[in-house]
Amino acid sequence: MAGKARVHELAKELGVDSKTVLAKLKDLGEFVKSASSTVEAPVVRKLKEAFPAEGSAPSSRPGGRPGNGARPMPPPRPGPAIGRPGPGSGTGPRPGPGGRPVPGRPGPAPLPGASRPSTPTAAPQSQPAQTQPPQSQPVAPQPSQAPRPAAAAASAAAPAPAPSAPAPAPSAPAPAPITSAPTAATPPAAPQRPTPGGPRPGPAAPGRPRTGGPGGPGGPGGGPRPGPRPGPRPAAPGNNPYTSPAAGPRAASGQGGSPSAPPRPGAPRPGGPRPGGPRPGGPGGQRPSPGQMPPRPGGSGGPRPTPGQMPPRPGGSGGPRPNSNMFQPRPAGGAPGRPGGGGGPGRPGGGGGGPRPGGGGFAPRGGAPGRPGGGGGAPGRPGGGGPGGGGRPAAGGRGRGGTTAGAFGPGGRGRPGRQRKSKRAKRQEWESGLEAPRMGAMVPRGNGQAIRLPRGASLADFADKIDANPGALVQVVFTQLGEMVTATQSCTDETLQLLGVTLGYEVQIVSPEDEDKELLESFDLSFGGDYADDVELSARPPVVTVMGHVDHGKTKLLDAIRSTDVVGGEAGGITQHIGAYQVRAVVDGTERPITFIDTPGHETFTAMRARGAQVTDIVVLVVAADDGVKPQTIEALNHAQAANVPIVVAVNKVDKEGADPAKVRGQLTEYGLVAEEYGGDTMFVDVSARNRTGIDELTEAVILTADASLDLRAPTGTEAQGVAIEGRLDRGRGPVATVLVQRGTLRIGDSVVAGEAFGRVRAMLDENGAQVSEAGPARPVQVLGFTSVPDAGDNFLVVPEDRVARQIAERRQARERNAELALSRGRPTLETILERMKEGEKTQLNLILKGDVSGSVEALEDALLKIDVGDEVGLRIIDRGVGAITETNVMLASASDAVIIGFNVRPQGKATELADREGVEVRYYSVIYQAIEDIENALKGMLKPVYEEAQLGTAEVREVFRVPRVGNVAGSLVRSGIIRRNTKARLIRDGVVVADNLTVESLKRFKDDATEVREGYECGIGLGSFNDIKVDDVIETFEQREVPRT
């Protein structure tokens, strides 16, 4: 071809299939997509050079079309052959195992025009090892009548003698060894290993007749060839990429002792490739190893040999689809040492292919007859012209004409070849990989079973309780409750309870106290509780808490008892911390220790007073004689009564003018405190903290009340437990906690945990700053060694080791974090979404709180959050802590536009310089109510201004003038007030507002512009583009004035 050519046209011209051409082009470095692709002329020349013989030598179709100038087939290359040795002597057919001859399939009739061998085959030597394959000239095969299947089966019963003279054979010629005179029914000789280089005799498969002589199976009436000798067959090399992995070893008929049944006539030949391709040896004999076989035509690795370079075609089944330029005429008979093979079945629709001329058909693999092939093909058609081949094996293979085993090398034996996955199989695998996991797992139902869950529990926690899959619960929450929740996300109490109702469980949310108790029980620990019977109890001093209204003299009274001056050190003259002291009072000549706890009286320290009432034994309620009962007095009284502790009332400031102690007694009677002199059981003591009068009576009343109503005993030999009264961050000492030991003895070196803080006791200090080595019950001390500042009111206890303390603290932190996440998350509804949208629009003040002690920070936070100046402004505390203001606080405030509030603390290091550089405002306070007042004023200043309308004046329209390029101008008379230019106006007609939000754009007095016109004067008023002005209309002007927020 001179120009471009398509691949399939080149394949037809070269006498090969398109796949071979595509493979050769790939080897030549030319990429071609498919058989319909075109290639350039230089590529065509390169391809023809690679196939010189195929492109020039003529060929004839199998089936009998004579070819002109057929070249003789070259002899096979001599080489070592590994196979079963043939008989040592004798020319008769070899019997199969057991002495029975194997019925063979009749050979095909020679086609018209078939050539005869030009020269007779030479007789071999007596030893097969010395036999050399003779040369033969290809001739056209002669047509002959193919025997019917019944006749073939009958003729297969008797053995046929070996041919002694050349005879016409319906096949392409191939040299065949001629043995000596046959001996019928002679048992086979002992196996003998052939000498390398000799011919490879080997039996054909059952049902395959032997060819090559007159009267043989290739001709009419040919007898069957004996079956193969028993024994395994080694794997032969194969390079067929399309070999089915299901094709296993040959059936037992080719290797075992019993021959298989003959295949059905017309059935497709098993395991054979498409007709017309390179043929491997037929089954039945032991195949040689790769190194002992002659080079295979069409194999991988090198250019395809020309027909002149190829050895005689083996008798195996066909390969690629035949065409008119593909085959050369061959003499009858198989290659030396190789049996003849049957032809492959035809293409679908073209009928079953007949056996190749000169060879018998294959027996089915797997030992069972396969599926029948197509009908006999017409002479001259590729693959046709004879009865159908052998049956197809049940073990699979390729469709449309059988397997391709042998097309590119024998397959199905030894190592299984790789099989291509079909598009359907790949699609199914892909779809199965994309299949979503099924979530329809069954969730166990509960019949009112109770489940205890902590605050902020997740669906995974719920699933652990009911032994279910968390993913199933996620699906239930989504489908039943309509809420998207992950398996590890903290859920609100409402969500957990609704899920329990849906599944039939009663969900009980564990309180923080019970949750902490369960946590300690998991470590074999407990806090509080009754004492064991075998625990030795010792007397302890009473714990007394002083409570009352602000400025009623609580701290001054404690100073009088302790003979100190604490009030002088308090900022603003008010107590802002919980102070714990232990004093010794002499009662009835005996020195008795008493522990006093001072609580703030300001309204913002409610939590401190509540904690003071919980840890105390007796409450001393201080009431000023000149001021009487106040709100914080009632609040402190309620705390004491809620704690169920006895109360002693100290009426202070009795030395002041206007003091009325009797009035105080009368007021407290209304709240259930009846004085002893009034017939009650409450002790009232009149004291003066300034003059230090009545102090001894007060301490005596405390001791008498404690002895009369309390059992003041506690164990001292157990691990210490108590409560953290206060916590602060000391610059030189780190976190410092003021604790009150309630039971046991606290010693230096103990591992302690208090709330979310833990550590080891490094030092202990008393109220005077002196170090102590141990602290017994009812003893307040300052403890150093915590990793963080404990919160005021946290319980502390001693644990066996630091590891346990750390684990308890971490679990408490996780518990609080989950609870906060659950509260902050909530259940999203339309109302909450709208509220969040409104919150995004309103102004917000961000604060960072730093204080000296945890109790003060807590009180300040609670007080600030109670400030309410309206819904337009919000207050958010983004961080709080104990200790000095650090650079980290400044950076956080800079990132969030927050203001830092320092309560009794100062900046640390370069925090001041960083705050100035970042523009962060830092405010310092020492009195809590000053901080509250400033923050409240700041919030009010952030409120949006409120405007109200103020009327300026009215004017009556007397005449309407039309001015070009200006519009209508109202000639008016000012009736009241002032009419100003550029002010807002509205037009009123018959008492109805016609137009509102107008602007007085022009104001003239005659022809002069005027800024304002007063009452009683005439003027011209222009309202811009508004021209609907009529006589007797009233123009009213007004302005918006800002109203201060209160």
Swiss-Prot record:
Residues 598-601 are annotated as: G3. Residues 548-555 are annotated as: G1. It comes from the Bacteria. Pfam families: EF-G_D2, GTP_EFTU, IF-2, IF2_N. The keyword RNA-binding does not apply. Keywords: Cytoplasm, GTP-binding, Initiation factor, Nucleotide-binding, Protein biosynthesis. Residues 210-222, 334-414 have a biased composition (Gly residues). Residues 688-690 are annotated as: G5. Residues 49-448 are annotated as: Disordered. GTP binds at residues 548-555, 598-602, 652-655. One of its GO terms (cellular component) is cytosol. PROSITE patterns: G_TR_2, IF2. SUPFAM superfamilies: Initiation factor IF2/eIF5b, domain 3 (SSF52156), P-loop containing nucleoside triphosphate hydrolases (SSF52540), Translation proteins (SSF50447). One of its GO terms (molecular function) is GTPase activity. Residues 415-426 have a biased composition (Basic residues). Residues 573-577 are annotated as: G2. Residues 94-111, 160-176, 188-206, 223-235, 260-281, 304-314 have a biased composition (Pro residues). The keyword GTP-binding applies. Residues 52-71, 112-139, 147-159, 177-187, 244-253, 320-333 have a biased composition (Low complexity). Belongs to the TRAFAC class translation factor GTPase superfamily. Classic translation factor GTPase family. IF-2 subfamily. One of the essential components for the initiation of protein synthesis. Protects formylmethionyl-tRNA from spontaneous hydrolysis and promotes its binding to the 30S ribosomal subunits. Also involved in the hydrolysis of GTP during the formation of the 70S ribosomal complex. This is Translation initiation factor IF-2. It comes from Parafrankia sp. (strain EAN1pec).
